[in-house]
């Protein structure tokens, strides 16, 4: 077998392969022998069909089967011998496949880029340091109390944290518009559900009042006919309710688990959960900075075939999240996922090189610690640990996460890392 490799464009390669006629002829003869033993033709016993009838009836399909076997086998023999790291599936083009002649074909395929890491010392990472305060825990307790709140009707004016029931009719230039009318609409004030100015226009009014609110729809509003338009809403304020928070008693805290018997227990449990969430958020924030730095310092081309595979993965994930079926998934435009898919492939290649160049292997003790951390969020942590330890697929997933964390650590060891004091809210609610 002779081999000729050429670069067509970017990461695309074309390999011209010649398979000697002796190998082709032998493969055809052996396939005919197998067929002769198994084919059934009326009028002949199995295994006794004459060769010329087999040729007439099955010759073309037998040769196609031989071709289907020879192409990938000799292609992969060739790329393995040349140590070519292929991406995706090759496409074959037959140049010669005739009796008594060499089989000549070409395979077009993509390769993964050769990655040589550089500029790690130029990567800048800001590593937040955070201390969870008693005030942070107080805020979390307030959230829990609001989740358990009741509502009491009020004759006072509307305040920012009230709940109101209203009728409204919206109009633009004196004309009502579609979707701008509602009856007995319940609105939780302060949540920003309505367009700017709507909630603000209700604050300070009393139940039973009728009044107008002047607002302007945002330029990016979803309805084309309302973008940037000035509108008037006629409001009838039917009911105002104040939020009544439950008292912070032992009876209240008992709702949050069998081990939570006092306010002190609740605060301890909240701190533990906040610490776990904070740890994950900090790891994620640092990792994203490392990824951004790696990509910036090491721009690489990625195989289109690998990007397409990742696009399909993202499509399927989107379908699962939103309850779509396979047909709907296929209709989602690739442009929605292309940038993220490309980035994922880049990150995978760069991390693979970090792992390879640093000769990293998953730290089993670190994997056990990660499982213990996951298990601590459950009421029966020992059962969770045992479940993971007996499931090889889950264990491998954990090892992969650990290996990725070790790769991040390897980059951080060479990067420019600075620490910045931050608050819990700044890390957990960066958009707030």
From Swiss-Prot:
GO terms for biological process: 'de novo' cotranslational protein folding; cell division; chaperone-mediated protein folding; protein transport; protein unfolding. Gene3D superfamilies: 3.10.50.40, Trigger factor ribosome-binding domain, Trigger factor, C-terminal domain. It comes from the Bacteria. Its EC number is 5.2.1.8. GO terms for cellular component: cytoplasm. Its main location: cytoplasm. The keyword Cell cycle applies. Consists of 3 domains; the N-terminus binds the ribosome, the middle domain has PPIase activity, while the C-terminus has intrinsic chaperone activity on its own. Involved in protein export. Acts as a chaperone by maintaining the newly synthesized protein in an open conformation. Functions as a peptidyl-prolyl cis-trans isomerase. This is Trigger factor. It comes from Haemophilus influenzae (strain PittEE). The gene is tig.
């Amino acid at each position: 077998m002779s081999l000729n490799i050429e670069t067509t464009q970017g990461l695309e390669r074309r390999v011209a392969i010649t398979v000697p006629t002796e190998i082709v002829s032998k493969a055809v003869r052996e396939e005919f022998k197998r067929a002769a033993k198994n084919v059934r033709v009326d009028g002949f016993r199995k295994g006794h069909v004459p060769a010329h009838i087999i040729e007439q009836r099955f010759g073309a399909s037998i040769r196609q089967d031989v071709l289907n076997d020879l192409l990938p086998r000799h292609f992969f023999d060739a790329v393995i011998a040349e140590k070519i790291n292929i991406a995706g599936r090759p496409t074959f083009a037959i140049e010669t496949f005739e009796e008594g002649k060499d089989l000549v074909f070409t395979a077009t395929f993509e390769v993964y880029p050769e990655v040589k890491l550089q500029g790690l010392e130029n990567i800048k990472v800001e590593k937040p340091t955070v201390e969870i305060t008693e005030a942070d825990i107080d805020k979390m307790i307030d959230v829990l109390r609001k989740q358990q709140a009741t509502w009491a009707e009020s004759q006072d004016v509307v305040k920012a944290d009230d709940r109101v029931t209203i009728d409204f009719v919206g109009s633009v230039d004196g004309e009502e518009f579609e979707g701008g009318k509602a009856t007995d609409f319940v609105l939780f004030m302060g949540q920003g559900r309505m367009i700017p100015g709507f909630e603000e226009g209700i604050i300070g009014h009393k139940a039973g009042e009728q009044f107008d609110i002047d607002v302007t729809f945002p330029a990016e509003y979803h309805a084309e006919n309302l973008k940037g338009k000035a509108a008037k809403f006629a409001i009838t304020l039917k009911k105002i309710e104040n939020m009544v928070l439950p008292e912070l008693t032992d009876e209240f805290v008992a709702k949050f688990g069998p081990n939570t018997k006092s306010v002190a227990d609740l605060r301890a449990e909240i701190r533990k959960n906040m610490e776990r969430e904070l740890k994950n958020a900090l790891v994620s924030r640092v990792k994203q900075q490392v990824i951004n730095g790696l990509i910036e310092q090491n721009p690489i081309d990625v195989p289109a075939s690998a990007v397409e595979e990742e696009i399909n993965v993202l499509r399927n994930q989107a379908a699962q999240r939103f309850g779509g079926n396979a047909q709907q998934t296929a209709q989602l435009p690739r442009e929605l996922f292309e940038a993220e898919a490309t980035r994922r492939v880049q990150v995978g290649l760069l991390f693979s090189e970090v792992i390879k160049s640093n000769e990293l292997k998953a730290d089993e003790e670190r994997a056990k610690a990660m499982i213990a951390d996951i298990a601590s969020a459950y009421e029966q942590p020992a059962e969770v640990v045992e479940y993971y330890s007996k499931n090889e697929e889950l264990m491998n997933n954990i090892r992969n996460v650990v290996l990725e964390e070790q790769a991040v650590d390897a980059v951080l060891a060479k990067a420019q890392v600075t620490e910045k004091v931050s608050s819990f809210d700044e890390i957990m609610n960066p958009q707030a």
